[in-house]
Design a protein with these regions (language model features):
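Solvent-exposed loop/turn segments connecting transmembrane beta-strands
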Residues: 30-42, 106-117, 144-154
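Cleavable N-terminal export/targeting peptides
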Residues: 1-24, 165
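N-terminal, post-signal-peptide region of Sec/Tat-exported proteins
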Residues: 44-82
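Short loop/turn motifs that connect adjacent beta-strands in outer-membrane beta-barrel proteins
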Residues: 19-24, 52-53, 92-103, 124-128
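Short glycine/proline- and aromatic-enriched beta-strand/turn motifs that initiate or cap beta-hairpins
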Residues: 17-56, 87, 156-158, 162-164
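Transmembrane beta-strands of outer-membrane beta-barrel pores
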Residues: 31-37, 60-66, 89-93, 109-113, ...
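Predominantly the C-terminal beta-signal and adjacent terminal strand-loop region
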Residues: 59, 63-71, 121-165
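Membrane-embedded beta-strand positions of outer-membrane beta-barrel proteins
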Residues: 27-31, 58-60, 85-87, 105-107, ...
């Protein structure tokens, strides 16, 4: 019984201290699945707090499974990878969400486009949570992307684990 009570108290303290975004000096790391039309893969991102409601960061993705084109050609490494610089507005406290939750719209400047994303984080403990993000290109660097240029240059959905560093 003592072990059960001790474990319950430790978990309660961990859940009570969980916080999705703390502000300046906060560092988050996300690791998840990248899902889009024509392929799926892995995505990582990291965000660094600048102020109470602002952060900047970096994101990268690599498509592990990507569809062949009409001629049977497979995308090369350069077609499968993407990297972006991002800026977020962390609005969890603005919307008076629980401290374990954060919603963050943002802008991306990447290898293939200028885009936007909307994300949500929920932390179960001080160091571990889940996240989900949806992103869209606003302006592609190629006026009419065709073939493999469409990979990483379209609506994308990410879901995975979030870590407080």
């Amino acid at each position: 019984m003592k072990k059960f009570i001790t474990l319950s108290l430790l978990l309660a303290v961990g859940f009570a201290n969980a916080q999705a975004f703390k502000g300046k000096g906060d560092v988050k790391f996300n690791l998840g699945v990248n899902i889009q039309d024509g392929g799926s893969g892995i995505g990582i991102s990291s965000d660094f707090g600048l102020g109470e409601n602002m952060s900047y960061g970096f994101a990268a993705s690599y498509l592990l499974s990507a569809s062949s084109d009409d001629l049977g050609n497979k995308p090369e490494f350069g077609d499968r990878i993407d990297a972006k610089f991002r800026f977020n507005a962390n609005l969890g406290n603005v919307f008076q969400l629980d401290k374990k939750m954060d919603i963050y719209p943002g802008l991306d400047l990447g290898l293939r486009n200028f885009g936007a994303h909307l994300g949500f984080r929920y932390f179960f403990t001080e160091g571990f949570g889940i996240f989900t993000e949806a992103g869209i290109p606003i302006a592609s660097y190629k006026t009419s992307p065709v073939g493999f240029d469409k990979l990483n240059n379209q609506f994308v959905f990410n879901i995975g684990a979030s870590f407080n560093l």
